[in-house]
Amino acid sequence: FVDINDWIDGRQIAKHRTSIERLMRELGLTTRHDFISMARCLALTDTFWMKRADEDISWNDVSLYRNPFDDVIARIAFDGTGIYGRQNSPTSPEFATSGSFAKCWVREGDQVSLLKRGSEGYANAGFEPYSEVLAAEVLQAAFIDHVPYTIENFHGKLASKCPLFTSEKVGFVSAHRFFDGPFDVEDVLAFCDAHGGDESFREMIVMDAVMANVDRHAGNYGFLVDNDTGGILRMAPLFDQNMACLPMMMEHDDFDVYLSMIGPKIGASFVSIARALITSDIRAKLVALKDFEYTDPGMGYPAWKLAAVNRCKDRMIADILA
């Protein structure tokens, strides 16, 4: 970051989500000073935090890795319900959790997990949690580093669930943070080459094509870093594939027409960018995936949609390898 005020504002990244914006308003978090006093600028991506110079408080008192989360704030973040007007704990990661979908962090014993809902309000809404599970399944079959996902009902809402992949020792920095201005695929490849190799980035791009992931962007992939030194360790495991595997497709949609209307955020088309970045090792993975079939994720997932997702996988692999 260039300016400390910009950094603080960035820690309030979740405030555009309706429930979080309402919560921050109810808690009186209207200024940077309010936000620092209440939330300490804490996040689960690193170990930075803030306090007043004269404040008698330590990292052990506020760490999101060491303290219980505020269940009320988590519930509000997830579905917009909860108890307002009460004293809330500062140890909540919700204020600094990015993304437009309603979500919350929960601690179950030593495990911290993210629960994320699907969309609402229209006929083809709500399939995004299934997409996370399906994407994780094909990434597992391809032996590609990824965050595992399951699906469950949480407070009566369908949600995907995945474990936290950072810790007090290892943090996460999204890709766009490493570039001062606009950047393209060649810039990212060069950056990866300078930090251990570009195979993982190439795998991500090709597998996004296989999964028809329409929402891969520089905020939902990045690198693991040493929280003590800031040094880059490696590319982070793949996560946030809730817009892969045709979540918005409807039963009456023509398959070929639908595929022709969607594309990636990185590259001109799924097939062209995958062909440009594929390597011999990745090609071998795609050949092996010809025999792979997605399994029913359960929880009411429609049979027609499962068939469409498998058909999409077959089509994408055939076109990439052609």
Residues covered by each model-derived region:
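Conserved protein-kinase catalytic-loop segment immediately C-terminal to the catalytic Asp
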Residues: 217, 222-225
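Phosphate/dinucleotide-binding and metal-coordinating scaffold of catalytic cores
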Residues: 1-212, 224-322
